[in-house]
């Protein structure tokens, strides 16, 4: 019976949110008021609210603000265009391609280099770059922020670029750009400016729960997963010259790919159902 009661409260509130009767930014009624409305105990109401929090449709509430219906202004990331085709880095205005793409989607965007460090390769990064676990690499961490009228600035993405030491230490005009603690922009990108033309990308996407560090930086609600996009850059010799690992709140980002479909011809011995 207890399960049925909290589910009844959950279903009613979720329906109000889905129909827009409780709109983004609206205050969710207090536990005491909901208990009176439905005629159930506050503990039953709390179970329903906890489920809505885990679904990511209401905030967990803090202090006098209480719980609110979450705003869902999605950030679109066009990965077909990102780092492909006409490279949109703008050295004159100190804007790289991510910022240019964010601007094209209507966002004001900025990024900071939060950290440049020589670290031992974690297992996952070692697999991406095909190096031994513990190999010393340079990690360059950028924090990417977006805002627009009516939407306060928020961290959209943690972008970590991992590079072999032999590449990270290369210099242009006496400066190693991958070791700089500030944003560096070159026509065609840093790696091309260093002499590494990436001829192939391998992308891997996963959804997982955030680490404590990621949850703190992204301000994700309890129970909210993060998305992780890893792009491995490979040069003409087959060498993996870097991996860019981007982590973002799973309820704030939409990834887009446009993929051409090659013409396929049926064969006599293979049946197809399209």
Where are these predicted regions, by residue range?
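HTH-adjacent hinge/linker in prokaryotic transcriptional regulators
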Residues: 4-10, 36-37, 50-133, 169-182, ...
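Short helix->loop/beta-hairpin flanking segments within DNA-binding domains
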Residues: 8-26, 37
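A short alpha-helical element within helix-turn-helix/winged-helix DNA-binding domains
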Residues: 25-40, 52-53
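Residues in the helix-turn-helix
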Residues: 44
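DNA-binding alpha-helical recognition surfaces that contact promoter or target DNA
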Residues: 47
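Mid-protein regulatory/catalytic core that forms ligand/cofactor-binding pockets
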Residues: 87-228, 234-237, 241-242
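Polybasic (Lys/Arg-rich)
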Residues: 239-240, 252-254
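Acidic, metal-coordinating catalytic segment for phosphate/diphosphate chemistry
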Residues: 246
